[in-house]
Every structure is written in structure tokens, then in C-alpha cells.
From Swiss-Prot:
Family to which this protein belongs: Belongs to the endoribonuclease YbeY family.
InterPro entries linked: MetalPrtase_cat_dom_sf_prd (IPR023091), YbeY (IPR002036), YbeY_CS (IPR020549)
EC number of this enzyme: 3.1.-.-
Species the sequence originates in: Parasynechococcus marenigrum (strain WH8102)
Residues noted as binding Zn(2+) in the record, renumbered to the chain: H135, H139, H145
Cofactor remark from the record: Binds 1 zinc ion.
Cofactor list: Zn(2+)
Keyword Nuclease assigned: yes
Function: Single strand-specific metallo-endoribonuclease involved in late-stage 70S ribosome quality control and in maturation of the 3' terminus of the 16S rRNA.
Protein name (database record): Endoribonuclease YbeY
One Pfam match: YbeY
């Protein structure tokens, strides 16, 4: 599978940020690996069109709080910054698109919010951006978290993807002792 990635890495970046975060190839390799990992496990929901495609296409944009607030206000009627927004193309695809290339949609991430969250969680910006990109990707693939159970399953899959993705299995969310904010993402 190939990935046609439209990367808008305009920033705002700081001189301390790893240069790999603005390299298209870095994100292409990561995203293809994650998509193939999900497609390889029939127990994980993923549109068949994606798994059958020779090529997938998506946009990834790194921006600031002001821009993501405007997008969040326009598309979700929430006039506040958020960490990641996803605009899925598959939800609106009429009929059966050409499976040679499937447009997934766009992921928009606020670097300002990502930096704050990385600091709050005690990890680096690279880890936070990988977390947010994986979350956005899952939304593009049809995942959602309207309740705690589905959010826990989604977050578990994100952790497994970030940890290498081998033998991805979602644990029974009822066996997980955790409290999560369903509206956090």
C-alpha cells in the first residue's frame, strides 16, 4: 500500500523540535504501517475499501490554536482550541469509489495544544504528535468514541500502534479500570 500524503507542516515549530516531524516520508512510513497493521487484523474495524486499496490519500496539517479554534467553531460549533480534528472523506463518499486510491480525509493538529499536553503528560512532542495523528487516523477509518467503552477501545489501539503495532488486540474494555473523559478528543 502506498500513501499520498499532503503534509502542511507550516507550524508553528520551535528550533528545538525534531526535524523529522516535518518530513513527509516520516509520516508516510508511520501511517502506512498503522493502516496495514489495522487491516491485517480482521477483528479491528476498518473499511474494506481501505484494506483493498493500492493507494490511500490523506492530508495532515500542523497548525496553531487560533486556526484550530476557528475550524472547531465552524465544524463542531465549539469556540475553543482542541488538539486534533479529523475530517473523514469516507463518510461522504458516494457509491463505491475506485479502490486503486481511496481518499481518507484530513487530520488537523494544533501544535500549541500538543506542546501543552506533552508537558502535562510528561512525554516529548514526538510522542504527543504520534498519539494525536493515530487518533485522527482512527477517526478517518470510521472509529468514534460516543461512550466510555468505545473511547477506551480506541485509546488502547492507539497505544498499541505507538508501541509497534505487532499483535494488536483490543482488551475487553470492561476489564480496564480507568476513567476517561469521552469529550477529551
Amino acid at each position: 500500500m502506498e500513501l499520498d500524503l499532503a503534509l502542511d507542516a507550516a507550524g508553528p515549530w520551535s528550533p528545538e523540535d525534531p526535524s523529522s516531524l516535518i518530513e513527509t516520508q516520516t509520516w508516510q512510513i508511520t501511517l502506512v504501517d498503522w493502516i496495514q497493521t489495522i487491516c491485517a487484523d480482521p477483528s479491528l474495524p476498518c473499511p474494506a475499501l481501505v484494506c483493498q486499496a493500492d493507494e490511500v490519500s490523506l492530508g495532515l496539517r500542523f497548525t496553531d490554536d487560533a486556526t484550530i479554534t476557528a475550524l472547531n467553531s465552524t465544524w463542531r460549533q465549539r469556540n475553543q482550541a482542541t488538539d486534533v480534528l479529523s475530517f473523514a472523506a469516507l463518510e461522504e463518499a458516494p457509491g463505491l469509489p475506485d479502490v486503486s486510491c481511496v481518499e481518507l480525509g484530513d487530520i488537523v493538529i494544533s501544535l500549541d495544544t500538543a506542546r501543552r499536553q506533552a508537558s502535562e503528560h510528561g512525554h516529548n512532542l514526538t510522542r504527543e504528535l504520534r498519539w494525536l495523528v493515530s487518533h485522527g487516523l482512527l477517526h478517518l477509518l470510521g472509529w468514534d468514541h460516543p461512550d466510555e467503552e468505545s473511547l477506551v477501545a480506541m485509546l488502547q489501539l492507539q497505544e498499541q500502534l505507538l508501541d509497534g503495532g505487532s499483535n494488536v488486540r483490543i482488551r475487553d474494555p470492561h476489564s480496564v479500570d480507568t476513567t476517561v473523559d469521552v469529550n477529551a478528543h
